[in-house]
Regions:
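Active-site rim/loop-helix segments in enzyme catalytic domains that contact anionic ligands
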Residues: 1-114, 141, 145
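Metal-dependent de-N-acetylase/amidase catalytic core
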Residues: 2-13, 84, 93-239
């Protein structure tokens, strides 16, 4: 195709709370879209410095943890194909306590800057951790505030959204992404987050045994009007 007539790159903005959220929850999906040429930008609100895992045996401490977790996240981004990484420099476990208007404004600025087709974040009630819920709530508010033309989705843990009725949703509210072809990248990114995964023996088993622990699909809850009710297996709308 002539360079002048190439279709513009699709863009995805992921706004999460901690290093490793991108890998542990939706690493297969991010690797899939990166391999298809999607330009991915990741925001990590914190550096995860209050995490309790210090390696196995422990090799880091509270003072060295922020730098090490940032380094490990950068490696995971390279592994998954995430092109851009931004930190909001919020202290871990305090996202819900920062000035929310300022946080929403920072996320809105990122949305304007990146102009993403897809925004990923946590569900404000199903995030499973106060930081997750807080960043999800702020991102949802920023998405609405900007009246952005893209689509908003909420990430979900494991296969919890295989039965969305348990959470007040229906199968039509869920997008199911086949990540089977990208599990090797997901496993490699797990291993990049060394200080967080060394205690999990299965991550470091022979590759085929470790890969067998992953599901073949990752699930996303639709969060914006233009995608609600559409049964799909892709986060990007056909234009």
């Amino acid at each position: 195709m002539n360079e002048l007539h190439k279709a513009p790159s699709k863009k995805l903005l992921a706004v999460f709370a901690h290093p490793d959220d991108e890998t542990f929850i939706c690493g297969g999906t991010l690797a899939k879209y990166a391999s298809e040429g999607v330009e991915i930008t990741l925001v990590s609100a914190t550096r995860g410095e209050m995490g309790r895992r210090m390696g196995n045996p422990p090799y880091i401490n509270r003072e060295t943890m922020p730098a090490i977790r940032e380094m490990e996240l950068r490696r995971a981004c390279d592994t998954l194909g995430i092109r851009h990484l931004t930190f909001f420099d919020i202290r871990d476990k305090t996202v819900e306590f920062v000035d929310q208007n300022r946080l929403i404004g920072s996320i809105a600025d990122m949305i304007h800057e990146v102009d993403p087709d897809v925004v990923l974040t946590f569900h404000e009630k199903l995030g499973g951790h106060p930081d997750h819920c807080a960043i999800g709530k702020a991102t949802t508010a920023a998405f609405k505030q900007t009246e952005h033309k893209g689509s908003l989705y909420f990430i979900s843990f494991g296969d919890m959204m295989k039965q969305p009725e348990r959470y007040g949703y229906t199968p039509k509210d869920v997008v199911e992404i086949d990540v089977q072809a990208h599990l090797e990248a997901k496993l490699a990114a797990f291993r990049d987050h060394r200080c967080q995964t060394e205690i999990d023996e299965w991550v470091w088993e022979e590759d085929q045994k470790a890969l067998a622990r992953f599901g073949s699909y990752e699930y996303f809850l639709k969060g914006s009007p233009e995608v609600v009710g559409q049964q799909r297996s892709d986060l990007f709308l056909v234009k």
